[in-house]
Amino acid sequence: VNIDSYTKFNEDGSNQEVKENLTVRRFHAKYHNEVAILKIGIVDKTFADRLLLGFMGGYEYKQTQNASTMDWVYGARYTTANTLMPQLTYEKRFKVLKGLHVSLNGNYNFGKSYSADTASCNYNWLGQSQPKGVPGELSYMKYRYRDHNGAANFRMALFPADGQSVSLSSTLTTFSRSGKDETAYKPTYEHPSQ
């Protein structure tokens, strides 16, 4: 990464901006993603040309090196995500007129995500850190998300004659997210004594 300035951490705890053109190496930008997909089903049966049940499971780990601008440098922020998604695929061709083709595809994700910013220090582009009195490089958090999103698509195509087709398609999508910051202040209410 080419930078034109960086924050120098002095031994007395002070900071100063150094204007210098440097090429530095990213030190906190790892990314890891793995996915396993399993599909099982039947083909060429009287009730279905193709009927598949599937499952996709995935895991992602991503370190965050900088904010949307290069001015904010991070050295410990990261996110993780898990994907658990069942899937269904159905296709059938009927011998009506020149053909009727029906298909249904659907999936639903039961995902979880986690974002963490817990380091009690600041970093510069040289990979050096300086302790600070409060946790969080940007804002202290241990945020857990639950994502539930799904999609279903139904398509029906009719071929009344050569070179002609009529099709109908409908798609349904759904999304919901809930989250909780494990570091958030949780006030307790005490009932006043009588």
Regions of interest found by a model, annotated:
Residues 39-59, 81-194:
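Face-selective signature of the C-terminal outer-membrane beta-barrel domain
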Residues 1-75:
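Periplasmic-side early beta-strands and strand-to-turn transitions of outer-membrane beta-barrels
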Residues 13-20, 25, 72-81, 124-130, ...:
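Short, Lys/Arg-enriched charge-dense amphipathic segments
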